[in-house]
Amino acid sequence: MELIHTCYRITDVDRSVAFYRALGFEERRRMPIREEAINVFMGVPGDADRLELTYNFGVDSYELGTGYGHIAVSVDDLDAALGRLEEQGIEPERPPYTVREGGSRLCFVRDPDGYRIELIERRPD
């Protein structure tokens, strides 16, 4: 078994692609779906397409629902990743913190459509 991808419905293709690029994702391909939508597939270097961003034409907003939590993304340098996001006006929900002494640093941000993203800078064991 393998987790193939996660799909988010987005309201602005360029803004969403820029957000995920700032985290280190690469845009792999765009696939139109008739006259209804376009899917943008993204992945991190060395891995398959794991994120599908779906833009439905004529839809202005979505309700996120109460069942969604977040996705977690590993970053090499949390401060650098936050700096790239701050250039886009994205701020962390609260300052980064260390899970336990000598452990991973992390924080949460929201993507342009409000989805929570956990950013984790792992420390060597």
Model-derived features: positions:
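N-terminal beta-strand motif that seeds the catalytic metal site of vicinal oxygen chelate
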Residues: 1-17, 68-73, 120-125
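Core segments of cupin and vicinal oxygen chelate
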Residues: 2, 7-49
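Short amphipathic alpha-helices within nucleic acid-binding modules
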Residues: 19, 79-84
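Vicinal oxygen chelate
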Residues: 29-32, 41, 73, 82-125
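Exposed loop/turn and edge beta-strand positions of beta-sandwich/beta-sheet ligand-binding modules
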Residues: 36-38, 67, 103
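Short, charged/polar surface micro-motifs in flexible loops or helix N-caps
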Residues: 45-49, 59-60, 78-80
